[in-house]
Curated annotation (Swiss-Prot):
Protein name (record): Histone-lysine N-methyltransferase EZH2
Domain CXC: from-to ranges: 517-619
Region annotation Disordered: where it falls in the sequence: 208-231, 356-444
Molecular function terms, GO-annotated: chromatin binding; histone H3K27 methyltransferase activity; histone H3K27 trimethyltransferase activity; promoter-specific chromatin binding; transcription coactivator activity; transcription coregulator activity
């Protein structure tokens, strides 16, 4: 690399020239490195092939080859064509064999590669044309401007077209580091000029001795500056931004350079990453930071990580649970429980002899846990009442006292087993009581992992300190309570339960919902053209009025919405006692499947592992598809055949594929129209299902104006999904057809043969 002289230019034009020259140099070096890697890999593979060939040659030399005996053909038959094989080795005799002509075999239809899917897959829009499709000379002759129009749809962006405009993260960092040398060289020139001026002034004023001292001081300062690596100048990022405007502004490039250089440091964590709570580097962080990965990666609509159906849709961070575990045990868990701890700022002590006397007395109360409010200072009894149930619990340390018999040991074993199972399912129920040691708790320090875990659990169990202590495992409820008091300013209180307002009855809720449907004039045929994608609404403490996104999109509020459970726009489900396959069912009328969380009487929530369910309106979400066979079609290309008989209106399969936007579907559709093969299916006004690259076998079902199947877009747990149903009774082995809803001109263009109708 050739650097400029000491008196180099410093204007923006010069920096642009430097960016271009360094970029071309780095691209060339990368190309050379890639060529060297290919050469070395080719040489290595070639060497392995030669070594393997030598081994095989040695094995063949040790073997004795025996000739293959061929039966002599009958030469008396006329018209028989013979094939003669002569060998150059004396060990092999001349071989003559008759030729047999094979009949022509029909070739299989053309099929483009595709990836099988069992559910829809959301993908981003492709803003760059990855490859220019080959259409054949005939299509290009008919429409020579097709390729140009296709490139215009992608704003002229073609992968690999702009060789000089390509810059990835690796080249970007190398380019900044290379340009930083120019910046350092300019600063050195300025410092040298400044130092020379100071030296001349000091020689004239203070003499040689003072000048030497100042020289040593300045040289030491320059040495220290060289030891610390400086951040690149803003001129570098301004020049790169001017050369590559699509990569971002100057500030964005600076932030990107910081992130990339920090990631290259040893032991560096990704941005917004909290150390493992079980690792040695665990830190004490807030609840939001501990749950950041959970809120980012966990889909609250599918209840799984890395959801492919909602990866680009932000979901609310809080999900309202109906049964929130904010109830606290009214009984203390032991004599050292936090309930006995503080009254008027003083710690109350109890004699140790109280526990054995109480423990020896059998309890007449039931062993079931009662839940109530935390007793306050006014309602707390003056004397502790500890029964046998509280003897072996988390704050009672007298577990090994005399007087315990074999029955107590058996009870302890059962409690320990129950504790381990409850800790594994802490989100479902409050953990049962855990036996700890007999010594009173001492003031101990909280580690970062324990403090972070406490802040996570306090948002679920609130003031149930006994349960939180059992989940943490290393702290007692008394210590948890003390830590809670210290952090009372940053932790939310438990939500108050309004016991005076009774819950609205189910029948009244359905009646109000029916009135609401009549107000918005719900169409019973479900043929509305305005079908929009559902997004959960999130407007706290505000009703779902005209500003609500669900009301604006003419969608019902679902269970994922953050609005009140009494919202008049919230779909309440059905109360059917039948099969939910008629318009008497509100779910069937609204063209949606029964929700197992809402429809509790029709059987949608029962027998989840079985296909024999009373509700017939939950087949898509259960995946109750039929067995389909792929074979060449009598109409066109490949077809799909059914292996089992199907009744009318019975679910056959779901039409799966990539979920793309309407704009992306328009760009892809222009290419598919030229191929005269399209797998696009409108899902709603926002998205389209494309089964060209990814899909399931139902994608091979052909078009017919007299089909035996029909497609229906249904709302399934907040998502639009396409179901294929039987239009009539279908026998085993029949090919499946449904109407693509082509226009008459498109039907003649794309479908050349109509299937033969069965004669009744």
């Amino acid at each position: 690399m050739g650097l400029t002289g000491r008196k180099s230019e410093k204007g923006p034009v010069c920096w642009r020239r430097r960016v271009k020259s360094e970029y071309m140099r780095l691209r060339q070096l990368k190309r050379f490195r890639r060529a060297d890697e290919v050469k070395s890999m080719f040489s290595s593979n070639r060497q392995k092939i030669l070594e393997r060939t030598d081994i095989l040659n040695q094995e063949w030399k040790l073997r004795r080859i025996q000739p293959v005996h061929i039966m002599t053909p009958v030469s008396s038959l006329r018209g028989t064509r013979e094939c003669t094989v002569d060998s150059g080795f004396s060990e092999f005799s001349r071989q003559v064999i008759p030729l047999k002509t094979l009949n022509a075999v029909a070739s299989v239809p053309v099929m483009y590669s595709w990836s099988p899917l069992q559910q829809n897959f959301m993908v981003e829009d492709e803003t760059v044309l990855h490859n220019i499709p080959y259409m054949g000379d005939e299509i290009l002759d008919q429409d020579g401007t097709f390729i140009e129009e296709l490139i215009k749809n992608y704003d002229g962006k073609v992968h690999g077209d702009r060789e000089c405009g390509f810059i990835n993260d690796e080249i970007f960092v190398e380019l900044v580091n290379a340009l930083n040398q120019y910046s350092d060289n300019e600063e050195d020139d300025e410092e040298d000029d400044h130092h020379d001026y100071k030296f001349e002034k000091m020689d004239l004023c203070d003499g040689k001795d003072d000048a030497e001292d100042h020289k040593e001081q300045l040289s030491s300062e320059s040495h220290n500056n060289d030891g610390s690596k400086k951040f690149p100048s803003d001129k570098i990022f301004e020049a790169i931004s001017s050369m590559f405007p699509d990569k971002g502004s100057t500030e964005e490039l600076k932030e990107k350079y910081k992130e990339l250089t920090e990631q290259q440091l040893p032991g560096a964590l990704p941005p917004e990453c909290t150390p493992n709570i079980d690792g040695p580097n665990a830190k004490s962080v807030q609840r939001e930071q501990s749950l950041h990965s959970f809120h980012t990666l966990f889909c609250r609509r599918c209840f799984k990580y890395d959801c492919f159906l909602h990866p680009f849709q932000a979901t609310p961070n809080t999900y309202k649970r109906k049964n929130m575990e904010n109830l606290v045990d009214s009984k203390p868990c032991g004599i050292y429980c936090y309930m006995y701890m503080v009254q008027d700022g003083m710690v109350r002590e109890y004699p140790a002899g109280v526990v054995p006397e109480r423990a020896k007395t059998p309890s007449k109360r039931s062993t079931g846990r009662r839940r109530g409010r935390l007793p306050n200072s006014n309602s707390r009894p003056s004397t502790p009442t500890v029964n046998s149930e509280t003897k072996d619990t988390d704050s009672d340390r007298e577990g090994g006292a005399d007087g315990n018999d074999s029955n107590d040991k058996d009870d302890d074993d059962k409690k320990d087993e129950t504790t381990s199972s409850s800790e594994a399912n802490s989100r479902c129920q409050t953990p049962v009581k855990l036996k700890l040691s007999s010594e009173p708790p001492e003031n101990v320090d909280w580690s970062g992992a324990e403090a972070s875990l406490f802040r996570v659990l306090i948002g679920t169990y609130y003031d149930n300190f006994c349960a939180i202590a059992r989940l943490i495992g290393t702290k007692t409820c008394r210590q948890v309570y003390e830590f809670r008091v210290k952090e009372s300013s940053i932790i939310a209180r438990a939500p108050a339960v309004d016991e005076n307002t009774p819950q609205r009855k189910k029948k009244r809720k359905h009646r109000l919902w029916a009135t609401h449907c009549r107000k918005i004039q719900l169409k019973k045929d479900g043929s509305s053209n305005h079908v929009y994608n559902y997004q959960p609404c999130d407007h706290p403490r505000q009703p779902c009025d005209s500003s609500c996104p669900c009301v604006t999109a003419q969608n019902f509020c679902e269970k994922f919405c953050q609005c009140s459970s009494e919202c008049q726009n919230r779909f309440p489900g059905c109360r059917c006692k039948a099969q939910c396959n008629t318009k008497q069912c509100p779910c069937y009328l609204a063209v949606r499947e029964c929700d197992p969380d809402l429809c509790l009487t029709c059987g949608a929530a029962e027998h989840w592992d079985s296909k024999n369910v009373s509700c017939k309106n939950c087949s898509i979400q259960r995946g109750a598809k039929k067995h389909l066979l792929l074979a060449p079609s009598d109409v066109a290309g490949w077809g799909i055949f059914i292996k089992e008989p199907v009744q009318k209106n019975e679910f056959i399969s779901e039409y799966c594929g990539e979920i793309i936007s309407q704009d992306e579907a328009d760009r892809r559709g222009k290419v598919y129209d030229k191929y005269m093969c399209s797998f696009l299916f409108n899902l709603n006004n926002d998205f389209v299902v494309d089964a060209t690259r990814k899909g399931n076998k139902i994608r091979f079902a052909n078009h017919s104006v007299n089909p035996n199947c029909y497609a229906k877009v249904m709302m399934v747990n907040g998502d639009h999904r396409i179901g294929i149903f039987a239009k009539r009774a279908i026998q085993t082995g029949e090919e499946l057809f449904f109407d693509y809803r082509y226009s008459q001109a498109d039907a003649l263009k794309y479908v050349g043969i109509e299937r033969e109708m069965e004669i009744p």
